[in-house]
């Protein structure tokens, strides 16, 4: 069964097809999933992700069932595989936002319904789909290639963007503090994909070098959910990595800024630059709705072929 746990399991053609279908559904909404049911399991808080999934299945003609970790017997020690067997047998899709990626993998092994990663500590693939759709809408793909800079932590967004750029043949430059490292296994996968796609990938510690000649600038919060106790240390380590006017002046003249939100002005991005690019950032957030619609339809079609 086809799940959506990471974009590394998807081909270039499948990824671009999802983006194109999202564009179609944004222009012309359709009830393509009449009476289908989506279970939404959250171990972490969510604003945009929950809204995108709940509205997506509803507007497609289906229903959403919200389940926090406190609602489930998982919180009392029930094995993930037992919960997966029950929920996966009752619904058509399962969306999960989890603390550990291994929880997703275990759930997917036993679920009869396709499982969607709505964020883990390793990957955030639905966000990158929304980013890709936004890049397309803002005409920042030339001949199918985008020039991207990612400035920030070696986190789930960095991993997902590295993998996606490698599969699609993009040019991506990543900049982060010297003591931050990308997983060797993820880096090796990206390098192998780049040999196939022709992607140009670079990793360094100078944000200005990464920003040169880029049309798309991506940043993310320095302190992810669950890292609140590390806030003081991380802010100190990321000093100098803020996206401000000076930083954006190094990118191409009409470059856009993307941020998955929530944004912390004065840290990863300045107030002035955030507001200057607010239109694209909040359209990026809205576009999550349409890529989720496309994703649900894709998984439903895949399941129907089995």
From Swiss-Prot:
Gene3D superfamilies, sorted: Aspartate/ornithine carbamoyltransferase
Biological process according to GO: arginine biosynthetic process via ornithine; citrulline biosynthetic process; L-arginine biosynthetic process
One of the record's GO molecular function terms: ornithine carbamoyltransferase activity
Domain of life (superkingdom): Bacteria
Pathway(s) per entry: Amino-acid biosynthesis; L-arginine biosynthesis; L-arginine from L-ornithine and carbamoyl phosphate: step 1/3
SUPFAM superfamilies: Aspartate/ornithine carbamoyltransferase
Chemical reaction(s) catalysed: carbamoyl phosphate + L-ornithine = L-citrulline + phosphate + H(+)
Residues binding carbamoyl phosphate, per UniProt: 46-49, 73, 97, 124-127, 260-261, 288
Subunit structure: Homohexamer; dimer of trimers.
UniProt protein name: Ornithine carbamoyltransferase, anabolic
Species this chain originates from: Campylobacter jejuni subsp. jejuni serotype O:2 (strain ATCC 700819 / NCTC 11168)
Name of the encoding gene: argF
